[in-house]
Regions:
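Acidic, surface-exposed loops and disordered segments
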Residues: 1-184
Length: 184
């Protein structure tokens, strides 16, 4: 069924395992509390005493106030207000400007994609092959996995040990390095 939701791509039908990376923007409050609790202990264990109070206060500001402010959603209205606020603040100092509800969705998916990349590198380190798939029916995938409304499917990764050259259709094509890299 997962293979069908992935548009019957060969990698899904030949893979030993399929890993689906899911975003949960709806859990931002509990995740922020979890990270804040962890960071308080982390600072107490690893920071000099004279710096602990300020570092804990900084984490409380970020995870207790800023994260809930950035990730809260309400029919696009909160995102619009954040955009107006950042435009005003941005007149006087540098500020992160990607704060609309759509922007925050992109941030969540980008963070999840970085976790997926780390997963694929770790799998390669253990001798396994991976194939990330972006072509899939996200609505069907959510239904198959019984994911809640607030969840989003970020990426599907086929995993296993390659069977020779099966599944390899030809040479890889890549954009030239100097077309995507610019030294500043």
């Amino acid at each position: 069924k997962i293979s069908k939701a992935c548009l019957d791509q060969t990698a899904t039908s030949t893979a030993s395992e399929i890993v689906v990376f899911v975003t949960r923007q709806d859990l931002y409050r509990s995740r922020a509390r979890f990270v804040l609790d962890f960071e308080r202990g982390n600072v107490r264990r690893n920071s000099p005493r004279e710096r602990q109070e300020k570092r804990i206060k900084d984490r409380e500001l970020y995870y207790g106030k800023l994260m809930p402010f950035l990730y809260a959603r309400f029919f696009g209205i909160l995102g619009f207000l954040r955009v107006l606020l950042t435009k005003a603040i941005g007149l006087f100092r540098p500020i992160v400007r990607e704060v609309s509800e759509g922007d925050m969705r992109v941030v969540v998916h980008k963070s999840c994609a970085l976790a997926a990349q780390t997963f694929m590198i770790a799998m390669a380190n253990e001798g396994y092959d991976t194939c990330p798939l972006e072509g899939f029916d996200s609505k069907q995938m959510k239904k198959l996995l019984k994911l809640p409304h607030g969840a989003g499917v970020n990426m599907v990764i086929a995993c296993g040990i390659r069977d020779g050259n099966k599944g390899i259709w030809g040479e890889r094509g890549r954009v030239l390095f100097n077309e995507v890299y610019h030294r500043v």
